[in-house]
Amino acid sequence: DYFEVSKNHNIVKTIHMETEWDSNDPIGETEWLHKLFEMTGFPNALVAQAWFDRNDIAKVLENQSKYDLTRSIRHKPKSTNNPNTKLDNIKGSLKDPIFRRGYSLLKKHKLHFDLQTPWWHLNDATQLAKDFPDTIIILNHTGLPSDRSFDGLNQWRINLEEFSEQPNTAIKISGICVPGKKWTAKLNKEIILDVINIFGYERCMFASNFPVDSLCATFDEIYNGFKNITAGLPENEIQCLFHDNAIKYYNPV
């Protein structure tokens, strides 16, 4: 239960991320979440499911946008396993014309795009942001910097900097677990401060990625780590990272 694991922190509103509900029923999760909101007062906004390469994507987006809590859409684009593999001609990727055609419909419904992709595809995400400047892209999981080698982090920074140059981009700091290692502030401090430096505090926000990130730490360990790492920042910047930016981008009720 989210509120049990987060009870030591002042959670005032929640934003639900789609959980890859039955792809044949993308509206089902949205309906259920609205019923949950009516019963509990949570969640207060949601990122809904819609696969841009569906034949009926126009209808799916129209239906998702009718729900009061829907703010953004997530469709995880196809990706490669490493930066040395080409993405060209892969259906469902950021470069796929069918994917991009479906993506183009977000503007009509004033919906954001929550993007989960590894850093080596951020050049394609940058092009997407350029081609559709009226749609905000919120990069999930910090661009997945799991390769903590010198070269890996250097290329992650380069690609992230290029992506951040587009004014219609933002980033969520979450999902920075390293396989086989415990989440610690020492391990992740450099990553977090780099992201804030690259995007500026006005376009960054912390996210829990729970329950997935419970595989590498408790909620307290992660959020106390976030707080300790940013403790030296001005109070207004901390307020933006933990609260105001989430309000700005997701407009929770």
Which functions belong to the PLM regions below?
Residues 1-37, 224:
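An N-terminally biased module of ancient metal coordination in phosphate/nucleic-acid-related enzymes
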Residues 1-8, 12-13, 193-194, 198-205, ...:
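Mid-to-C-terminal alpha-helical segments outside catalytic/metal-binding sites
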Residues 14, 46, 106, 141, ...:
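Conserved, mostly hydrophobic/aromatic
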Residues 19, 50, 77, 142, ...:
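Active-site metal-binding loops of divalent metal-dependent hydrolases
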Residues 21-24, 54, 145-148, 178-181, ...:
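Short, small-residue-enriched loops and turns at beta-alpha junctions
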Residues 24-120, 127, 172-177:
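Active-site gating/metal-coordination segments in enzymes
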Residues 26-42, 126-138, 188-199, 222-231:
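Short, electropositive alpha-helical surface patch
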Residues 89-205:
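Catalytic pocket-lining loop regions of alpha/beta-barrel enzymes
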